[in-house]
Amino acid sequence: SDAIIVIKVIPLLAKIKMISIPRDTYTDVPCEKGGKVDKINHSYAFGGRECTIKAVEELLGTKINYSVVFRFDDVITLTDIMGGVDIVANHSFTQDHETFKEGEKYNIKGARALAYTRHRKTDSAFKRDERQRQVMQSIAKKLVSPSGWGYVPGVYSYMQEKMEISF
């Protein structure tokens, strides 16, 4: 896995909280032969979504009730369906011929959204994790706002047909 993000939805407070688990975090990977300690991002290769969920549950000591697997193509397609999402760049960089300047606001979609979420060469994995959470939050924020409700059927349809989801 490129990124593992745990999301907690608190409906009564209308809040969504996210944490990223660094991909190089060593933990028990229960699906690996012999159940050994390995990088958590290897759990997907050993047993897919279910193995990753088990590894995250063991690491955090909490139950994961629902999951979504986002692939690179999903970031491209979902942000395209939604007409882009708004972000404020957390770092200045160029990735895949896409340039971002720290502190500037952008509406990103498609390959530009993917470039923003994948960059880590000139800053850090932590900044990249922050960008990934930022794009996820922007997708959620747009879908729950009245102006974004029109995108919900297209996003839902795409997720049902093309993505690994459990909810």
Which residue stretches match the model-derived regions?
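Non-catalytic, solvent-exposed segments at the cell envelope interface
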Residues: 1-167
